[in-house]
Amino acid sequence: MANLRDIRKKIGSVKNTQKITHAMKLVSTSKLRKAEEVARNSRAYALKLDAVFDDVLSKMKNQGIKDIQSKYFRELERLEIKKVDIIFITADKGLCGGFNANTIKKVLACTNEYQEKDIKVRLRGIGKKGNEYFSFNGIEVLDKINDLSSMPNYERAQEFMQKVVEDYLNGKTDKVVIIHNGFKNMIIQEIRVKTILPIGHHIIHQNSQPSEAQETITSEPSGSEDEILDSLAKKYVEYSLYYALIDSLAAEHSARMQAMDTATNNAKDLVKNLTISYNKARQEAITTELVEINAGVEALK
C-alpha cells in the first residue's frame, strides 16, 4: 500500500506541474503574438533605414566621393582589426529550451575565433542569464544590464550604445558586433551575428533576404557628406541594438512556448505511465490479498 500511495503522490505532483507548464505555454503564446507584430513593424523600419544608408553611400560612390572623414564608416576589407567588442543578448529568465545556451555558445565560438587571430575581444552583456554565465565562469563582461532584453526600450538602448560608440570613436575598439537569437517563425529561432560598426557598403546584404525588395531614396539630403553620415550612423547604430532586442524577445517567447508545450506533453506521457504502474501495482496487491485469503481458508479446513 505504501507503494500505491507513493505513485498517487507522483501522479498528483506531475498533474500540478502539467497545469503550470500549460499555463506558461498559453502566456508565452499570447506574448509571442504581440512581440511578433512589434518585430515585424520594427523590421520594416530597420530595412528602410538600411535602404537610406545604402542609397546615400551609392550616390557618394557614384559622385566619386571616396574620402569620407566620418569615423563611423570604414571598409572592413581594408581595415586592420585588432580589437572587437561583442554585444550579446540573452533572456532574463530560463525555461526556454536552448535559447540562452545557443547564444552563449555562439559568443564563445566567435570569441575563440577572434582570439586565434590575436584579436582582443571585449564583451558587453544584455540579459541576466548570459551575464550570470560569464560571471560564474570568470569571464569579464565590460557593461552589464539585466532587465532590458525582457522589456526593450529605445531610450535605454540608446543610453547603452553611447559608451559603445564613444569607445569606437576614440579608438578603443575597431569593430562592434551584436550576437543574439532571432525570430524566424513560430517554431524556428536562429542565431544572428551583425556588424554594426564600422559601417560599410554591405548593410542591405547583411540584414535582408534576397527576396526583400528595397526602395530607392530619391530625396537629396542637405549638409556636408560627413554631417549627413554621422547623423544617419548614430540613428542606425542605436536602432540596430533596439531592433535586436525586439527580435530577441520574440524569439524568446517562441522558444519558451515550444519548451512549455514539450514539457506539457512529457507530463501527459508521464501521468499515463504512472497510471499504468499504479493500476498494475493495485492489481498485484488485490491478487496477493486474494491468495492470502484462499490460503487462510485452506488452512482452516
UniProtKB/Swiss-Prot annotation:
Q: Which UniProt keywords apply?
A: ATP synthesis, Cell inner membrane, Cell membrane, CF(1), Hydrogen ion transport, Ion transport, Membrane, Transport
Concerning Pfam families, the annotation shows:
ATP-synt (PF00231)
Name one cellular component (GO) term.
plasma membrane
Its transmembrane ranges are: none
Q: Which domain of life is it from?
A: Bacteria
Q: Which InterPro entries match?
A: ATP_synth_F1_ATPase_gsu (IPR035968), ATP_synth_F1_gsu (IPR000131)
Q: Which GO terms describe its biological process?
A: proton motive force-driven plasma membrane ATP synthesis
The protein's predominant localisation is membrane
Q: Where in the cell is it found?
A: Cell inner membrane
Query: Which CDD domains has this protein been placed in?
Result: F1-ATPase_gamma (cd12151)
- Which GO terms label this protein's molecular function in UniProt? ATP binding; proton-transporting ATP synthase activity, rotational mechanism
- Subunit arrangement? F-type ATPases have 2 components, CF(1) - the catalytic core - and CF(0) - the membrane proton channel. CF(1) has five subunits: alpha(3), beta(3), gamma(1), delta(1), epsilon(1). CF(0) has three main subunits: a, b and c.
- What is the role of the protein in this entry? Produces ATP from ADP in the presence of a proton gradient across the membrane. The gamma chain is believed to be important in regulating ATPase activity and the flow of protons through the CF(0) complex.
Record NCBIfam families? ATPsyn_F1gamma
The record's similarity note reads: Belongs to the ATPase gamma chain family.
State the protein's name: ATP synthase gamma chain
Gene coding for it? atpG
